[in-house]
Regions:
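C-terminal peripheral helix-coil segments that are non-catalytic and often amphipathic
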Residues: 1, 86, 93-97, 101, ...
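Generic hydrophobic, amphipathic alpha-helix propensity
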Residues: 10-18, 35, 60-64, 68, ...
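Helix-turn-helix
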Residues: 13, 21-55, 59-60
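Short hydrophobic clusters on alpha-helical segments that form packing/core surfaces
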Residues: 14-22, 95, 195
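Short coil/turn segments at alpha/beta junctions that flank glycine-rich nucleotide-binding fingerprints
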Residues: 24-28, 102, 145
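Amphipathic alpha-helical linker/stalk segments
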Residues: 60-91, 138-143
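Short secondary-structure transition hinges
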Residues: 86, 97-134, 155, 178-181
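Membrane-interface starts of transmembrane alpha-helices
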Residues: 149, 153-157
Length: 219
């Protein structure tokens, strides 16, 4: 859908307002009247831009997914066949930053799959499949060549991603558990060390203990 240039700023404002409210309240918990109020327009004007509420939801999700791609250093590590001790910290750096810098995106994806499941896979596939497919291929290669334990690469791909998204919230539900980390750099180290300890075969892990400790990649 395209709009006259003079209206594009207003449309962007509507989409931004919708993303905020849908992420906070869910799809069914958000009304177009609330979105119009937050965007400082009338509800009639909103419907001139978006005929249906669902159209606005998908526009807001696409706006948050736009530009999401693997970073250059991570892509290079994957394509060059760098070891897991190099690539996993790079992967966790991107996952942690996404969780911190794009919190609305994660909530919108959850809302899409819970409340609008019939189209969620199609929209998310367009943007997320290239990312997860590249990571999955890398993990599969390293499983095949013995650098990682023999596990299902697709399950591992899902586990790596969801651990970053879910672990901080689960920790809050465990009585007496300390905060999992103090900042994003420590978070990258925590997840990298944990998963390398879990995934690297014992004989390779012994060799890794002689190498410098895993740190977050430079910003």
């Amino acid at each position: 859908m395209t709009f006259p240039i003079k209206n594009s700023e207003q449309v962007n404002k509507v989409v931004h307002a919708a993303a905020q409210l849908f992420a906070r309240q869910g799809y069914h918990g958000t009304s177009t009247r609330e979105i119009a109020r937050l965007a400082d327009i009338s509800e009639n004007t909103l419907f001139r831009y978006f005929e249906h509420k669902e159209d606005l939801f998908w526009a807001s999700l696409r706006s948050r997914l736009s530009g999401l791609e693997l970073r250059r250093d991570l892509l290079s590590g994957i394509s060059d066949g760098a070891g897991p001790e190099i690539v996993l910290p790079q992967l966790f750096a991107q996952l942690v930053d996404t969780a911190i810098l794009r919190p609305e995106l994660l909530r919108l994806i959850a809302v899409a799959f819970i409340e609008l499941r019939w189209k969620a896979a199609e929209v998310c596939y367009e943007y997320l499949s290239p990312i997860f497919s590249a990571v999955n291929r890398y993990l599969a290669r390293n499983i095949e060549n013995g650098k990682l334990r023999n596990v299902d690469p697709s399950l591992l791909t899902a586990a790596l991603a969801t651990s970053v998204m879910v672990h901080p919230e689960i920790t809050k539900l465990i009585a007496g558990a300390p905060p999992p980390y103090s900042d994003s750099r420590e978070a990258i180290q925590v997840y990298s060390r944990f998963w390398l300890d879990v995934l690297v075969p014992r004989e390779m892990a012994r060799a890794r203990t002689l190498a410098p400790r895993v740190d977050a990649p430079p910003a």
